Amino acid sequence: MSFFFIRKIFGSTNKKIIKSFRKIVQQINALETEMQSLSDEELAGKTEEFKQELKNGKTLNDLLVPAFAVVREASRRFLNMRHFDVQLIGGMVLHNGMISEMKTGEGKTLVATLAAYLNSLEGKGVHVVTVNDYLAKRDTEWMSKLYNSLGVSVAFITNNLTDEERKEAYSADIVYSTNNELAFDYLRDNMKFSQEDMVQRGFHYGIVDEVDSILIDEARTPLIISGPVEENNQIYKHINKIVTKLVDSDYEVDEKGRTVFLTEDGISRVEELLRSYNLIPENSSLYDTDSMIMTHYIDQALRAYKLFTADKDYIVKDGKVVIIDEFTGRMMEGRRYSDGLHQALEAKENLEIQHENQTLASVTFQNYFRMYNKLSGMTGTAATEAEEFRDIYRLNVVKIPTNVPVKRVDIDDEIYGTEKEKFNAVLKFIEECYKRLQPVLVGTVSIENSEKLSALLQSHSLKHSVLNARYHEQEAYIIAQAGVPGSITIATNMAGRGTDIQLGGNAEMIAKVELKKIKNADEREKKYQEIVERVKKDKEIAIKAGGLCVVGTERHESRRIDDQLRGRSGRQGDPGLSKFFLSLEDDLMRIFGSDRMRSFLQKVGLKNNEAIHHPWINKALEKAQKKVEARNYDVRKSLLKFDDVINNQRKVIFKQRNNILGNEINDLLEVYSEVNESVVEGIIQSGYYEDYIENIVKEFHTRYGITLDKEDLAKFLNKQEALNYINDKIQEFFTEKEKYFNSQHTTDLWNTIVKQMMIMTLDHLWREHLSVLESLRQSISLRAMGQKDPLNEFKREAFLMFESMLEKWKELTIHRLAHFKLADNQEIGNRLHSARNSRLPKVSRNDKCPCNSGKKYKHCHGAVTVVS
């Protein structure tokens, strides 16, 4: 039963959707005995049976009940896990193209198998999207037993695969991959010179795990494949020295708006310093036409110092500035801030300054995932962003009931006057938990705070584990053991971690580590059973101690991130506890706290080392968070409107590329005709064409090296007759050229050259166009001062520029083809190879590929073969 039918008849309330799906669950349960009676071969044979029924006219909805029953039985046999009724409901939500909100520990990985299997029957591919390579690999290996038992192929894609391996993986029925890999493969495919080199096969159905993290938190970050632009990097070092000499009165910081402004005193001081470095003329001001570029460098340097903090927004690793994801605390290696900000940070940290990049291709997750014919998602926290999911992605959120009621207790926040007092209170609270062997998970918002708290625990001899961007490699194991009695785990933003915290520890993860060195099979089995028993006893101890205790050391801007941290505790009916410790020095309190809240706290009077508990404070904080979320949503919505303009143009360009790669070049005559008419129109802007015959002859000789006969042109009575004559001459010229090339080399050499020339010219102009559009987008807001709508102005100008670019592409392609000279095979091959690779920066074959794939250049774009 589809969601749209439900909404039409009953309305789209969560309760009614769940009620309707429970009826379908009863039908699935009724088939359980029948499925259990089937042999393994008969169960596997159901897949081909379903595919045949689809060919005979049935729909996926018709097959949902038996298909889900088959998956549940296969899971019971081969994974020793039986889908709960609520998991079946979650699978139906996914199949109907909605978001399934399921609490932590409710088995989202298993839920995905239901919708993935059902939709794979169409043979068009299913993408299951995870937040990191570890989860993609883990889930594939874990669920492959189920899929393979039913004759369904499954594969995963990580950043170290070659193009050949990627293409093979994408051909599987079900593919697990990260959002980054999928989107970058899409961009890389649309930079290829042959359809055979492309790895993806379309966007049929996608299931996005941690959907809020990917489609909301990362929505503003475009994925960019870029190449370096040559420029003088010394200027960043000079500007860095200038900014370090400024005092507080020289600038104003707006932390809410994430901007820094120079004051009048600051402008004067900067101008004086710029002159001392000979960066602007002696009598020039900062805002003179010739000097205004310096404001860009100054602005970025000020942002680097006043808005970006080491170990919070970025870390320095191996001599490079590595961005930290503000929502997940993960390092985003390979990504760089644009517009000179990354160079400003490198200058600030006294590192080697890398060249600023030029965008070769880009796409946002918003626009990438909207290409799927059907999209669905899973997360533990989506309800707070339900409006955005509905408006942007047309995805409705359905809250799935838990299999067992949640027993976790959420205690009111405690607020302290200073950060030091807050951390002392956290220390005392952790010590109390430690004494009763209650496992503790502490969430921090930055690496700096996690290491500060770690040092405090060390000074009190409290053994603990730290999980932040610095220790990403050990992430899964650390989190898996966070439920061991007496364990203390510190983690930056728990969003998207993806690994379940089980009370007593994760027996499988422990076994993987402890059994590594044991070769004897009997000894391994004995040791494994010991681990299982140990974990079982530890679970009982942890439960008696109160279950997992989650401690938040600061409220995040987003309620979802706080809820995700809380949600680590109380899985599958386990007991648990959560509590947040705050201070007036926290960012959220300092920047977004209301005047009313500050007034209230002042009246109450905070004494040293004393905390305030009050339900009103929790409500006030939630109100502040809602304001921030609403503002961030407005920003994302506005950015999407602008990006939609670029995205529509991107679709046209990529479609044009694929058309060129996929077809023989039979329509060149039409291109010639359009270009020729454009040339003649450009010459004859008014009056009779015969007055311009001299200019027409001269122009076509310059463009094509073709001599048109003046006397022949003079015979024609109007422009159209002349155009027909010119078109015939141009066609004759290129036909002769094609015959000659093919006779001297391979029979399809000319066709290959035409395709390459059209694509290389298009790619070059598209890159330039993207750069111009970005500049236009950054400056367009000023139009509002002239009572004009910036978005409408952007649409209008972007369209005109796009039309102009396409005309230029046609003209430039014909011009280059006309002047293309015949050379020996080797020279032609080298020329095509050189032109093809001019789009990417020069790198050695063992360096990382500049397309951000993470692979060596020789295994990525350096491995692409050229026509010889």
Curated annotation (Swiss-Prot):
> At which positions is Zn(2+) bound?
C849, C851, C860, H861
* Annotated GO CC locations: cell envelope Sec protein transport complex; cytosol; plasma membrane
List the SMART domains hit by this protein, alphabetically: SecA_DEAD (SM00957), SecA_PP_bind (SM00958)
**Top EC category:** translocase
What does this protein need as cofactor?
Zn(2+)
InterPro entries recorded? Helicase_ATP-bd, P-loop_NTPase, SEC_C_motif, SecA, SecA_CS, SecA_DEAD, SecA_motor_DEAD, SecA_preprotein_X-link_dom
Question: Main subcellular localization, coarse class?
Answer: membrane
The positions annotated for binding ATP are Q87, G105, E106, G107, K108, T109, D500
Q: Which Gene3D superfamilies match?
A: Helical scaffold and wing domains of SecA, P-loop containing nucleotide triphosphate hydrolases, SecA, preprotein cross-linking domain
Give the transmembrane ranges: none
Q: State a single Gene Ontology molecular function.
A: metal ion binding
| SUPFAM superfamilies recorded | Helical scaffold and wing domains of SecA, P-loop containing nucleoside triphosphate hydrolases, Pre-protein crosslinking domain of SecA
Name the NCBIfam families for this protein. PRK12904.1, secA
How does this polypeptide assemble, per the annotation? Monomer and homodimer. Part of the essential Sec protein translocation apparatus which comprises SecA, SecYEG and auxiliary proteins SecDF-YajC and YidC.
Q: What is this protein called?
A: Protein translocase subunit SecA
Naturally occurring in which organism (per UniProt): Wolbachia pipientis wMel
The primary gene name is: secA
